[in-house]
Amino acid sequence: MAKEGNCPRASILIITLWVLGFLTILVVNLGFMVRTQLQFADHLQDRLKMYYLARAGIERAVAELYKDENKSYDSFNEPWANKEEFFKDFAFGGGFITLKYQTGSLPGQEDITLYGIMDESGKIDINSVPLDILTILLERIGQVETEEAIDIARAIVDWRDIDIAVLPGGAEDEYYQGLSSPYKCKNGKFQIPQELLLVKGMTPEIFSRIKGIITVYGTERVNINTASFDCLYALGLSSSLCERIIKFRQGSDEACGTEDDFIFKSPSDLMSVGSLFTDEAAQINTLISRNMLAVRSDIFRINSQGILRNEKGERSREIICVLKRQEEKAPKILYWHEN
């Protein structure tokens, strides 16, 4: 039989063990919480550092753009457009900055990666492009049958114009209000290219094919020094002529953005691209007479990546900026997006 004096001692021992167990669990949990908070703080610090690296890339690009000495034309072989040693993996502030973009090549070839600033004026502005060119774009690049391309083009014009008159095959409020999830026809300019997906007849498949050659940023004339094969083809030029323009522009090394590139200093210089057939000369003259071609730019896209490389691997943040270059003034920001 146990002595009565041992019971309090046993109780004290049990309580002590319970307290020690509780304190152990508490310490472990506190340690886990502190470690998690430190990791989270470290993560936030890295995100902030990558953000400011990307911001620094934007400023670096703007400075290079404003050093451009060629005021009469803009092309791929200028430093702002393609300068790998300046825009690829530039070490700064404990990280790296990269500015790069892709431009279309000839059919059957992979897109070309360049390090620098993208000329947004080398694209077709869906806010101002005429109906007939819009139809050609949808037919040739969007791979849409002619009749369907005409209807989608008319629906796009109905979406962007300010009136409520419906073009044949187009659409205004009556159509959009009758959808299962109704909305209004905008009757105003497109603000982002993805807005096309709201237009009658436009599908994700068609949009994915045309998105690389369209813009919404007021470039009514296409820069023939930076326009891709697809963009030139969408303007109504023949496939053969588009290929000759690209090769003529690339020079003898057949590379984009190098010293031997040929630069068009006037839209009429297109007439010097080899021997033109009568219909090809007519195609060029038509675009020139409609004031749809240019050789310089004012609107540019900057894709700036802030990159960190350490024991955690490689991580990055990207800022996409579209700006308008202005003489004697700071650039005007037209679009800003942080990934």
Where are these regions (language model features)?
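Compositionally biased linear targeting/interaction segments
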Residues: A2, S11-N339
